Design a protein with these regions (language model features):
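Internal, active-site/partner-interface "lid" segment
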Residues: 116-158
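Structured catalytic/translocation cores of nucleotide/phosphate-coupled proteins
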Residues: 69, 158-159
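Glycine-rich phosphate-binding loops that contact phosphosugars or nucleotide phosphates
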Residues: 1-104, 108-115
Length: 159
């Protein structure tokens, strides 16, 4: 999930990193500055290494956004909570419902950030799409969505 969000924010022109490694999470937390933002993603919200990294980042003055269930230790440490509640999975510790809910929240967050950043973000996304088209990604099957609520942008092609 974090890698997906990192890639999306990067395409919008934001500096973002995703760290799964415990030690790199700690270093990333220590490297934060006042005004920095850490987005912590965990459905269960209780992994000690992630909680430690969040504490370190907050100690440096960073704000913490958490994508997690509302009743978790991570939620309690967040400055901004994107609380996600899904029923427990009968088989998996974290089931497909949780995965899809987190992915949907990441998509919504990406759209909101793009809208907030305005035209420069739209231009970056269009350049990325053009790069995909040049290298054989199936762009014709997946038309570019308009960020201004105007529907599908066909780039002058008939849809």
């Amino acid at each position: 999930m974090a890698n997906d969000l990192q890639a999306r924010l990067f395409r919008l022109g934001l500096s973002a990193n995703a760290w799964a490694d415990y030690h790199l999470q700690q270093v990333a937390g220590a490297a934060q500055r006042p005004g920095g933002v850490v987005i912590a993603i965990s459905h269960v919200g209780g992994m000690p290494s992630l909680l430690d990294a969040v504490d370190i980042a907050r100690g440096q003055g960073a704000k913490v956004v958490a994508l997690t269930r509302p009743d978790t230790a991570l939620a309690a440490k967040a400055d901004f909570l994107l609380g996600l509640s899904v029923p427990d999975d009968a088989v998996m510790h974290v089931g497909i419902d949780a995965y899809l809910t987190h992915l949907t929240a990441i998509e919504i967050l990406t759209v909101l950030v793009a809208q907030r950043r305005g035209e420069p973000a739209v231009q970056r996304l269009q350049r990325a799409r053009e790069a995909f088209q040049r290298h054989g990604i199936d762009a014709a099957t997946h038309p570019l969505q308009s960020w201004d609520g105007g529907g599908i942008n066909t780039g002058g092609r008939a849809s």
